[in-house]
Amino acid sequence: MSQVAPKWYQSEDVPAPKQTRKTARPQKLRASLVPGTVLILLAGRFRGKRVVYLKNLEDNTLLVSGPFKVNGVPLRRVNARYVIATSTKVNVSGVDVSKFNVEYFAREKSSKSKKSEAEFFNESQPKKEIKAERVADQKSVDAALLSEIKKTPLLKQYLAASFSLKNGDRPHLLKF
């Protein structure tokens, strides 16, 4: 059976969409980002803080911790674009980070209910309670990290100090 000709032709040619050859691949981290590296956070609530990099998560974020006891930075996810890796390293082989994954950091769904106008205007935001499980996890990671940090003189003070640029500092010439 031969091809049947179409009943009509379009007056103008319609260009076919260009085929894309892109595929989703896991992000390749910088060579300087290895677990145990001390990082400087560049953005967010804890910008300027020095933290210890623990592991890479499935969603291409980095798991870092202050430790909380030293500089107040809890276990959290950070985008690799917003960190500077320093040459300082901490041994993190004794830290158990196997339980931390993307689901661990997911927010709980809050039930949205209809509010009256009076409740809307006099409502104060309730203080968010931190789960006891999260506190226990933070303490266990901090204990393991602090035992390693204490082995290096002045490392605890280094992590507690925040990073900032002064007048005349040239970031492209600094050795981190």
Curated annotation (Swiss-Prot):
Keyword field: Cytoplasm, Ribonucleoprotein, Ribosomal protein
Function recorded in the entry: Component of the ribosome, a large ribonucleoprotein complex responsible for the synthesis of proteins in the cell. The small ribosomal subunit (SSU) binds messenger RNAs (mRNAs) and translates the encoded message by selecting cognate aminoacyl-transfer RNA (tRNA) molecules. The large subunit (LSU) contains the ribosomal catalytic site termed the peptidyl transferase center (PTC), which catalyzes the formation of peptide bonds, thereby polymerizing the amino acids delivered by tRNAs into a polypeptide chain.
Source organism per UniProt: Candida albicans (strain SC5314 / ATCC MYA-2876) (Yeast)
Location of this chain's protein in the cell: Cytoplasm
Gene Ontology CC terms, in alphabetical order: cell surface; cytosolic large ribosomal subunit; membrane; preribosome
Record-level GO BP terms: cellular response to starvation; cytoplasmic translation; filamentous growth; filamentous growth of a population of unicellular organisms in response to biotic stimulus; filamentous growth of a population of unicellular organisms in response to starvation; translation
Listed name of the protein: Large ribosomal subunit protein eL6
Predominant localisation class: cytoplasm
SUPFAM superfamilies, alphabetized: Translation proteins SH3-like domain (SSF50104)
Keyword Ribosomal protein: yes
Family label: Belongs to the eukaryotic ribosomal protein eL6 family.
Lineage: Eukaryota, Fungi, Dikarya, Ascomycota, Saccharomycotina
Region (Disordered): 1-27
Quaternary structure (record): Component of the large ribosomal subunit. Mature ribosomes consist of a small (40S) and a large (60S) subunit. The 40S subunit contains about 32 different proteins and 1 molecule of RNA (18S). The 60S subunit contains 45 different proteins and 3 molecules of RNA (25S, 5.8S and 5S).
